[in-house]
Amino acid sequence: MLNKRRSLVWGILMSRSTVITAVLDANVLYPAPLRDYLLHLASLGVYEPIWTAAIQDEWIRNLAKARPDIKRAALEATQRSMDRAFPGSNVTNYESIISSLSLPDPDDRHVLAAAIKSKAKVIVTANLKDFPSSALTPYAIRAEHPDEFVSGCIDRERKKAIKALENQVKALKKPPLSREKVLENLKSTGLIRSVAKLKS
């Protein structure tokens, strides 16, 4: 009985240790369909999401500028909802690391600093060229395109990935969207392989 209990505890610890921690760059939070699906995946424990106030401010600022029809207050409400839903995801006290880092675009160093501070293994970003492996490998961090990241999530946790899609469809009410339309929207954000896997 004791051995079974130890095995159960060890199994739980191992399952927790294999959950990937990933920093979500502003450019993957910018498109609502992709942001929603990433958060639905996280809500089912497929991975642990990480962001900072600076990352949140960046996507909100850029989206508000590109879409003046969307009120900034609504976007900020989304940010607050994210912080409430994932209370451990908003990383702080990483700023002191920034000056020691080197990236092609110095303005991206705060993202890497957040990854280092949170011990994340992945930076999910659409701009892979801004996060070369030569700059990330010393910290045991890698950059992944959202399609690569989500595709990997589907491979590891297919049932949860499908459930996340179902939850996303159910949550969309204004206006409601069909499963096919949600998949089409996800594909338009660059999730080519991922959508193919979700359809198969």
Language model features by range: what are they?
Residues 2-36:
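Metal-dependent nucleic-acid phosphoesterase active-site entry motif
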Residues 4-8, 128-200:
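Acidic, PIN/NYN-like endoribonuclease modules and their adjacent C-terminal/linker elements
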Residues 21, 32-66:
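PIN/NYN-family metal-dependent endoribonuclease catalytic core
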Residues 28-29, 99-107, 129-132:
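Acidic, metal-coordinating catalytic cores used for nucleic-acid/nucleotide bond scission
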Residues 46, 87-88, 140:
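A generic structural signal for alpha->beta connector loops
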Residues 50-94, 168-193:
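PIN-domain endoribonuclease scaffold, especially VapC-family toxins
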Residues 87-122, 156, 176, 191-200:
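Active-site neighborhoods of divalent-metal-dependent phosphate/nucleic-acid chemistry enzymes
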Residues 108-142:
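Acidic, metal-binding active-site segment of PIN/NYN-like and related structure-specific nucleases
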